[in-house]
């Protein structure tokens, strides 16, 4: 991937809709570039599969099953986060 040329070590990336498709591909590419990931999807099972791939790149990965159309779930998630350097808004 082209992101291998970019050093994202010590950066945290949040990817919504990361359980499948484009979101999953973005999360993996960011992990290849050295970023730590926070991945969100509605289904924990999908997140677990993606997290396993991300961990092969020695990146930390936090998963959060969340429906981004649910205000309460999103608010609870936001209150737990301290630092996000990169946002990929892919859900929906």
What annotation goes with each model-predicted range?
Residues 12, 36, 60-62, 83-85:
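Structural signature of beta-strand start/N-cap positions in the alpha/beta core
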Residues 30:
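Aromatic pocket-lining residues of Rossmann-like dinucleotide-binding sites
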Residues 12, 17-21:
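Conserved glycine-rich cofactor-binding loop
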Residues 16, 84-92:
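Rossmann-fold scaffold of SDR-type NAD(P)-dependent oxidoreductases
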Residues 35-49:
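Conserved glycine-rich Rossmann-like NAD(P)H-binding loop of the short-chain dehydrogenase/reductase
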Residues 1-11:
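Flexible N-terminal pre-Rossmann segment of NAD(P)-dependent oxidoreductases
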Residues 45, 64-76:
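The beta1-alpha1 cofactor-binding region of Rossmann-like NAD(H)/NADP(H)-dependent oxidoreductases
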């Amino acid at each position: 991937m082209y992101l291998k040329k970019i050093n994202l070590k010590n950066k945290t990336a949040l990817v919504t809709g990361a359980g499948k498709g484009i979101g999953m591909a973005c999360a993996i590419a960011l992990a290849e570039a050295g970023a730590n990931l926070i991945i969100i999807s509605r289904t924990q099972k999908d997140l677990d599969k993606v997290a396993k791939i991300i961990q092969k790149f020695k990146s930390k990965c936090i998963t959060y099953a969340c429906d981004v159309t649910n205000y309460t779930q999103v608010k609870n998630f936001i209150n737990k986060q301290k630092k996000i350097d990169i946002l990929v808004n892919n859900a929906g």
